[in-house]
Amino acid sequence: MRAVELLLLLGLASMVHGLCSPTVFYRDCWIRRFPGMLLDLEESQRLGAQFLKYYSENTGQKCGRSCCLRKDVSCNVAVFFHDPVHDNVNCLHVHCPTLESCILEPGASAILYNITAGIDPDLLVFEHTSPIYPNSRSSSEWWDRLRILKAMSVGSEGVYPDVMNRMVPSTEAASTTQQDLGANTGISYSRKSTTDVGLRFTSANVSTATKVNMVSPSTDFTHSPGNKTISPFFGPTDTRVSQVPSRSRLNISKPSVNKTKGSHSRNHSSENEEPWDGAPASAGVWLACVTLGAAVISLCCRVVLGTSRCCGKRQGWSHMGQRSASGCRRNTLKENS
């Protein structure tokens, strides 16, 4: 019995762990965790990664949040080691300017945290602000591919860089700088920003992010054919240009844009669908009421018929008893006479 209970508890824990989202929001930062992954620090430093801090922390959550709270430098990667190599030093902070500068490898006793700037989801819902971070599902798919390829190349050395070179897009389109993003507008601005967002690991300058937010996009930019945002390899970034302009910027009427629905193609049918949604429910209620009433009426009729039959039978037996008694009296009188 104890073994069965233990198995049930383990299964419940695995289900709860699967339901938990790997991405959380904390202090204007999106923190995405990748269990079983760590960073090859030496190789990453050769490719341009910057070592920031290596210290002791209580939990992996605090390690990732402390990387988010760093204001002196831009910290976008944190690695927490459950089994520290050195004296209780288990938290590593690194800044990776590009995707190619971070070389990852599997590690059973480590958790990698990707920290990117973002907007509070409550503000996105109640203030109708367009999302700046991309879909996390595409990022998780890239990471699943990375884990599979890395697991295949664990036994041999020198295979992982080749896999990364085939898997990661080229860095030629990443030549656009943060200042170009803040200065350009229109269609040319959209093409540069989307390609740069797709290849950068995170944004390294907060001032340029404010410049991007201050630029008001035009209608031509919103409907331009080249405005296709490429999902980054890691989590959300803070410089992605909004695909749907806000209501305060372009002054669009309500029937054309309905941001609470989440899809532009469903706006024309959202108001007409409400009566149809309530009709089946009301019909079901009426049908249940009619069926219940018919059942009650039939039950009452059966009860009345049953009681009437019982009363008739009792009256018949009483009449027969009276007749037999009167016949017996007559016979006795005749015999006595």
Swiss-Prot record:
Could you list the residue ranges forming a coiled coil in this record?
A: none
Origin, by domain of life? Eukaryota
Q: List the disulfide bonds.
A: none
Query: What membrane topology does the annotation report for this chain?
Result: Single-pass type I membrane protein
Q: Which residues form the signal peptide?
A: 1-18
**Cellular component annotations (GO), alphabetically ordered:** membrane
Please report the stretch or stretches of sequence annotated as the MANSC domain.
33-113
Identify the residue ranges that face the Cytoplasmic compartment according to the record: 300-337
Extracellular-side positions: 19-278
Q: Check the record and name the InterPro entries matching this protein.
A: MANSC_dom, MANSC_N
Positions glycosylated per UniProt: N114, N227, N251
Q: What is this protein called?
A: MANSC domain-containing protein 4
